[in-house]
């Protein structure tokens, strides 16, 4: 959601008066400056669909499972040439099966499969079997000790992540945690993650953030949320729910059992570091510990591994249960990245892997290797709405009334602005982000600066946008509102840079530009392009204004409290303010559909996995929702494990 919501705390800016003499510059573009298209070009309109829903996803673009000996030797692909997009694997207690999550049914749709690995030495699985596949998230599967039941997490029936158990013989499944006794406050985090069976099959341990606070990173100042997890247990029939371990100010995740069932081990990390753990600029400095407690009492706390490094995915090996036995775990993100063992009997293995899990005898380890190459423009995605075909786009897509698509090439280029046909063909450069010499190339490379949120004029002749430093670099950088001709021949600055200004939108009649200011002043401003006069529409910490197609209202994001942002609308004369969302989590980056509905991104259903497990993301809980202009009829349009945002409907008439 950060690619779409990213501009509230990290991108708010405002400005109010401007010199009438704006900077005017002739664009001198060199064809060599044109960013790489990376586009799946010319995809036709989908048969039987109304058109395409373009959206952006922040998450890995590839993930492949591997199996190796515990010492790292004899590594091979688990699925051989049958690999698709798989992750989060685990062995059955008898070592005969590996359960894993796969998106082979569509990019973004996570389902659970298993394969037989009794002949692991030959390097590949056999007997590939689908366990559960629905449009909801299914993840983190774990087989019971007797092999008859599957514990897993799912967002089915309410979109929040809960612990489920499925009978493998009958297919019957039940939700263990979404009950009146267990479910937390619906306005607070209420997710349940990473189930693990006790050796006797009598208990399932898991982590949960139920009834914790929505808390921003940076001591509550950041837009993106941290996560506070405790360890809980429940019986497979849904009874006996209780807390096993908790620690104020800390996140306790991925619990696993000792082989005699007397202790539970987990990783322990500060709540603040759950943000740093999935940010590439900070993960190397994160420290965590591997800790266990007595299951019955929650006491007798033992630290098995501590010191520098982010340590995760602990798992007991060899059957011993005292403080000197062997626990395997992952080190993520620093120079020692790979997997390690507390006993020292097996040497540490340096490897760029994620989510390792070991066979119960400790002989084999399974894990994934992920890639983050940007998805191609127009790459097909899983579609949750049968009327629309979902495809990938770079950020800030907008369709002109003439049917031309404009985007910022943040993932596929250098945050310049390009236009194209909606099928990805006929790519043209509108504005090179380096044209004015204002941007720091290092910040552009990190995605912290660029030409953001291009918006069309009604006649398709102009594109307005913000140019400058964004996110955390906004605090010391500048940003101005610009516009450029759609053919890239000319551009001009519309604000003078005195106040950080950005995220503009054209009025339907083409006379006005709405934008936000941040820093010296806050709020939404409206610039009259004929007179160059500016007036204040709001004076709060508002952001991301967008004019409705009929010009009667603007939708925007408002900071309604120190920890929460909501979607609001207002008339262009400043009257009739309406707050349309109230989830308790962030709701933001709203845009209008052509028929006057509102698309936006939301964290209202909470995290889909433990926050520290993610990589290179901002708000991994972000999903896309559509609602009517008055805030009614809210409906989820995505249900993935990843950060989804930047929606745009493209009707078939523009794709043929």
Model-derived features: where do they sit?
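Fungal secretory targeting signals
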Residues: 1-21
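Beta-strand-rich domains and repeat architectures in extracellular enzymes and scaffolds
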Residues: 31-70, 74, 83-90, 393-398
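Residue-level detector of Asp-centered blade-edge/turn motifs that repeat once per structural unit
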Residues: 47-49, 93-94, 145-146, 199-200, ...
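Hydrophobic beta-strand positions that form the internal "hydrophobic ladder"
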Residues: 53, 98, 150, 204, ...
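A flexible loop/linker signature enriched in serine peptidases of the S9 family
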Residues: 57-64, 80-85, 101-113, 131-137, ...
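Short loop/turn segments that connect beta-strands within beta-propeller blades
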Residues: 69-73, 116-121, 167-171, 235-239, ...
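Conserved beta-strand position repeated once per blade in WD40 beta-propeller domains
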Residues: 88-90, 140-142, 194-196, 254-256, ...
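Blade-level signature of beta-propeller repeat domains, shared across WD40, Kelch, NHL, RCC1
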Residues: 619-656
């Amino acid at each position: 959601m950060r690619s779409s919501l990213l501009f509230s705390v990290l991108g708010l800016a405002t400005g109010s008066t401007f010199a009438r003499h704006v900077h005017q510059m002739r664009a001198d573009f060199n064809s060599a400056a044109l960013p790489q298209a990376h586009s799946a070009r010319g995809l036709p309109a989908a048969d039987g669909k109304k058109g395409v829903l373009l959206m952006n996803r922040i998450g890995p673009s590839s993930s492949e499972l591997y199996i190796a000996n515990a010492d790292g030797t004899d590594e091979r692909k688990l699925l051989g040439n049958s690999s698709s997009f798989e992750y989060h694997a685990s062995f059955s207690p008898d070592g005969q099966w590996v359960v894993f999550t796969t998106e082979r049914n569509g990019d973004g749709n996570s389902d659970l499969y298993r394969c037989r690995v009794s002949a692991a030495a030959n390097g590949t699985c056999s007997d590939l079997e689908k366990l559960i596949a629905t449009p909801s998230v299914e993840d983190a599967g774990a087989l019971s000790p007797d092999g008859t039941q599957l514990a897993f997490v799912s967002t089915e029936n309410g979109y929040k992540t809960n612990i489920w158990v499925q009978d493998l013989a009958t297919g019957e499944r039940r939700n263990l945690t979404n009950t009146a006794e267990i479910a937390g406050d619906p306005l607070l985090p209420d997710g349940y993650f990473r189930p693990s069976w006790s050796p006797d099959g009598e208990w399932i341990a898991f982590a949960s953030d139920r009834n914790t606070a929505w808390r921003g990173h940076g001591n509550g100042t950041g837009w993106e949320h941290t996560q506070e997890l405790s360890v809980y247990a429940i019986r497979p029939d849904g009874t006996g729910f209780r807390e096993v371990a908790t620690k104020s100010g800390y996140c306790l995740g991925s619990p696993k059992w000792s082989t005699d069932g007397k202790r539970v081990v987990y990783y322990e990390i500060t709540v603040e570091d759950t943000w740093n753990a999935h940010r590439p600029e900070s993960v190397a400095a994160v420290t965590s510990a591997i800790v266990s407690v007595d299951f019955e009492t929650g006491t007798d706390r033992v630290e098995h591994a501590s010191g520098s490094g982010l340590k995760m995915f602990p798992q007991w090996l060899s059957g011993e249960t005292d403080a000197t036995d062997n626990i395997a775990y992952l080190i993520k993100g620093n120079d020692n990245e790979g997997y390690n063992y507390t006993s020292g009997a097996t040497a540490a293995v340096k490897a760029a892997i994620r989510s390792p899990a070991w066979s119960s005898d400790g002989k084999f380890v399974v894990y994934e290797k992920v890639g983050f190459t940007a998805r191609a423009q127009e790459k097909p995605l899983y579609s949750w709405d049968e009327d629309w075909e979902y495809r990938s786009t770079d950020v800030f897509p907008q369709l002109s009334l003439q049917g031309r698509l404009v985007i910022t090439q943040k993932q596929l280029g250098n945050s310049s602005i390009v236009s194209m046909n909606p099928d990805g063909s006929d790519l043209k450069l509108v504005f090179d982000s380096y044209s004015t010499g204002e941007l720091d190339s290092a910040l552009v490379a990190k995605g912290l600066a660029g030409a953001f949120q291009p918006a069309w004029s009604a006649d398709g002749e102009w594109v307005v946008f913000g140019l400058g430093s964004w996110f955390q670099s906004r605090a010391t950088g500048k940003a101005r509102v610009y516009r450029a001709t759609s053919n890239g021949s000319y551009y001009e600055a519309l604000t003078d840079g005195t106040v950080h200004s950005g995220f503009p939108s054209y009025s339907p009649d083409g006379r006005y530009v709405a934008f936000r200011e941040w820093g010296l002043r806050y709020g939404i401003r409206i610039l009259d392009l004929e007179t160059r006069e500016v007036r204040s529409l709001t004076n709060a910490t508002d952001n991301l204004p967008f004019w409705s197609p009929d010009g009667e209202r603007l939708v925007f994001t408002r900071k309604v409290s120190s920890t929460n942002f909501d979607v609001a609308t207002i008339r262009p004369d400043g009257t009739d303010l309406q707050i349309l969302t109230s989830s308790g989590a962030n709701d933001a980056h709203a845009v209008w559909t052509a028929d006057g509905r509102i698309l936006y991104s939301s964290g209202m259903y909470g995290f889909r996995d433990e926050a520290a497990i993610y990589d290179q993301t901002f708000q991994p809980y972000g999903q896309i929702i559509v609602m009517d202009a008055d805030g009614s009829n809210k409906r989820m349009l995505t249900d993935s494990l990843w950060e989804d945002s930047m929606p745009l409907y493209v009707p078939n008439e523009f794709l043929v």
